[in-house]
Swiss-Prot record:
Cofactor(s) needed by this chain: [4Fe-4S] cluster
Stored InterPro entries: Aldolase_TIM, Methyltransferase_A, RlmN_N, RNA_MTrfase_RlmN, rRNA_lsu_MTrfase_RlmN/Cfr, rSAM
Compartments where found: Cytoplasm
Name of the featured protein: Dual-specificity RNA methyltransferase RlmN
Claim: Cell division is one of the keywords in the record: no
Organism: Buchnera aphidicola subsp. Baizongia pistaciae (strain Bp)
Lineage: Bacteria, Pseudomonadati, Pseudomonadota, Gammaproteobacteria, Enterobacterales
Keywords annotated in UniProt: 4Fe-4S, Cytoplasm, Disulfide bond, Iron, Iron-sulfur, Metal-binding, Methyltransferase, rRNA processing, S-adenosyl-L-methionine, Transferase, tRNA processing
Length: 373
């Protein structure tokens, strides 16, 4: 299907209600609003998320009359996926069309595990200096169907053996484009679908929300959802974090750590422990005393530390710390009793590694299109 036909199809679909926008409670309300019983929502959700069915006529345990009604009123439509790329290490990346712009989604198969890295916004407003996404500016929050549709569509490809991945998606990480906590409502609705027994029925321990630390949203997150939490800290003090992450001038390290403690107090996911993400930048944040500072920051919080070798992108002056420096940094923390992992670089050759995701984004702040390849 060419883009003109696709856009015409999407215009027609916009007149219908996209059921991918509904978690179970919203689906029940919708079914009641069209004169149907609540339990029909459960039946339809199972068809959508456990049989990957987007054709109401194939939902054989509901009446023909209801199937016709749903076909008239509703659709099951994820965003369009283009430009499927496969890395030498097996990592896969897609461009995902959002209007006339696009985001990126990455699938990482490894042994018996398949991890999907999804985006939550079209662009990102945080402008972290070491991240390519942040250089593109921000356009909009993704809606629920655009978030859950990334998981649903790739899971459907695997389910029907349309791509060379054997195991279904076991882990979802919100580590793609955008800051999830700046799109809190839509992200939470999508997470509820992933967790629901009539939805994707995933474990909360296998879903990770990664945030730069939007403190007001982080403080109330526990009242809305319980999933594993990762926080992009990337510095051992506020001076460095201000340089790397402008959001730190609004929500400094101390306020972020306080919000983390509150979330962990209520959360049962991931053994009540936060993952601290720390990008390794040569001469910036990788000295031995930075490791000491990091330990002192975190010693009152149950945590594990994920050291991330920085991935180069054009136009950046940063340099990744070398392997010796990264290992020395890790060993300092390990000797103090920290759990430390060093992230393995996946998908670098197709620009699918951490910090490399881009797309086509119309930056609303500067009123221009940013397209980085």
């Amino acid at each position: 299907m060419n883009m003109i036909n696709y856009e015409c199809k999407m215009q027609k679909i916009k007149l219908k209600t996209n059921l991918l926008n509904f978690d179970l409670q919203s689906m029940k309300k919708f079914f009641c609003s069209i004169g149907e019983l609540e339990f029909r929502a459960q039946q339809v959700m199972k068809w959508i998320y456990q049989h990957y069915c987007d054709d109401f006529n194939k939902m054989t345990n509901i009446s023909l009359q209801l199937r016709k009604k749903l076909s008239t009123l509703c659709c099951i439509t994820p965003p369009k996926f283009l430009n499927h790329k496969v890395s030498v290490d097996g990592t896969m990346k897609w461009s995902v069309v959002i209007g006339n712009q696009c985001i990126e989604t990455v699938c990482i198969p490894k042994n018996q595990r398949t991890t999907l890295c999804i985006s939550s916004q079209l662009g990102c407003s945080l402008a972290c200096s070491f991240c390519l996404t942040g250089q593109q500016g921000f356009n909009k929050n993704l809606n629920v169907s655009e978030i859950i549709g990334q998981v649903w569509y790739i899971q459907k490809l695997i389910y029907f053996s349309k791509i060379n991945i054997t195991n279904k998606i076991t882990n979802v990480v919100l580590m793609g484009m955008g800051e999830p906590l700046l799109n809190l409502s839509n992200v939470v609705h999508a997470l509820r679908i992933m967790l629901d027994e009539f939805g994707l029925n995933m474990s909360k321990n296998h879903i990770t929300l990664s945030t730069a630390g939007i403190v007001p949203a982080l403080k109330k997150l526990h009242t809305m959802i319980d999933v594993s939490l990762a926080v992009s800290l990337h510095a051992s003090n506020n001076t460095i974090r201000n340089q790397l992450m402008p959001i730190n001038k609004k929500y400094n390290i101390e306020s972020v750590l306080c919000a983390i403690k509150k979330y962990l107090y209520y959360s049962n996911a991931n053994k009540k422990r936060v993952t601290i993400e720390y990008v390794m930048l040569s001469g910036i944040n990788d000295a031995a005393y930075h490791a000491e500072e990091l330990f002192n920051l975190l010693k009152s919080i149950p945590h594990k530390i994920n050291l991330i070798p920085w991935n180069h992108f054009s136009g950046s002056n940063y340099i990744c710390s070398n392997d010796i420096t990264i290992n020395n940094f890790a060993n300092i923390l390990i000797k103090k009793g920290c759990i430390v992992t060093i992230r393995k670089i996946r998908g670098y050759d197709i620009n699918a590694a951490c910090g490399q995701l881009s797309g086509i984004v119309f930056d609303r702040k500067f009123n221009k299109i940013n397209c980085i390849s």
